[in-house]
């Protein structure tokens, strides 16, 4: 192999590595495109038969819980709003704190932004509810992050707002499900619910 051919081969591989690494830093949707923070997406369970579409679920009264509805064909779309916004970049990055907001209204007259609820006395789990944080967890309850699983295009959602408060000590957790009275609710502190993002 000539020196020029070898140099071209090395440069092509370095370029491919750089491109692959930069794409790997972003959340990608079901079409393989980076998820953008100004677009609506449906969050789908990556494992079919795992409960249906993400939606608002009534557990007791207001606020609504975030859950899955097997009878809802679409569920509600969400908007992802990063804690640190870069005006020149619309893509949602992996492992960065962000807000998850359902694009829907409620009869509770409150925000449909996801937040971490208090630990449930019966299940010991922390449910994902909606509304602006009322300082239940030091006003950091509305910040979640998306992390890659070993499978391309499949992610976990975590609550661990260390970007919002780097010096804080959080009891971090990954979002999973709880089945309660015929309802499927999202909660931390159990098995993870792998998800995919589908552009609306």
Swiss-Prot record:
Localization per Swiss-Prot or TrEMBL: Secreted; Secreted, Extracellular space, Apoplast
Family: Belongs to the protease inhibitor I3 (leguminous Kunitz-type inhibitor) family.
Superkingdom of this protein's organism: Eukaryota
Name the UniProt record assigns to this protein: Kunitz type trypsin inhibitor 111
Cysteine disulfide links: 62-108, 160-172, 165-168
PANTHER family, sorted: KUNITZ TRYPSIN INHIBITOR 2, KUNITZ TYPE TRYPSIN INHIBITOR 104
Keywords associated with the record: Apoplast, Disulfide bond, Protease inhibitor, Secreted, Serine protease inhibitor, Signal
MF annotations from Gene Ontology: serine-type endopeptidase inhibitor activity
Keyword Repeat: no
Feature type site, description Important in determining the strength and specificity of the interaction with its subsrate: 169
InterPro entries: Kunitz_inhibitor_STI-like_sf (IPR011065), Prot_inh_Kunz-lg (IPR002160)
Keyword Signal: yes
Signal peptide: 1-24
One Pfam family in the UniProt entry: Kunitz_legume
């Amino acid at each position: 192999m000539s020196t020029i051919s070898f140099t071209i081969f090395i440069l092509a591989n370095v370029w491919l590595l750089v491109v692959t690494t930069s794409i790997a830093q972003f959340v990608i949707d079901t079409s393989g495109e980076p998820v953008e923070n100004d677009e609506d997406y449906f969050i789908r369970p990556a494992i079919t038969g795992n409960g249906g579409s993400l939606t608002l679920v009534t557990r007791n009264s207001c606020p609504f819980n975030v859950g899955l509805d097997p009878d809802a064909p679409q569920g509600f779309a969400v908007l992802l709003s990063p804690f640190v916004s870069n005006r020149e970049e619309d893509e949602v990055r992996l492992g960065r704190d962000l807000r998850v907001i359902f694009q829907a209204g409620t009869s509770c007259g409150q925000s449909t932004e996801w937040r971490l609820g208090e630990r449930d006395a019966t299940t010991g789990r922390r449910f994902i509810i909606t509304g602006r944080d009322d300082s239940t967890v030091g006003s950091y309850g509305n910040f979640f992050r998306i992390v890659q699983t070993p499978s391309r295009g499949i992610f976990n959602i975590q609550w661990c707002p260390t970007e919002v408060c780097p010096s804080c000590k959080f009891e971090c957790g990954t979002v999973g499900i709880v089945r309660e009275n015929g309802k499927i609710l999202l909660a931390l502190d159990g098995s993870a619910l792998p998800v995919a993002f589908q552009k609306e």
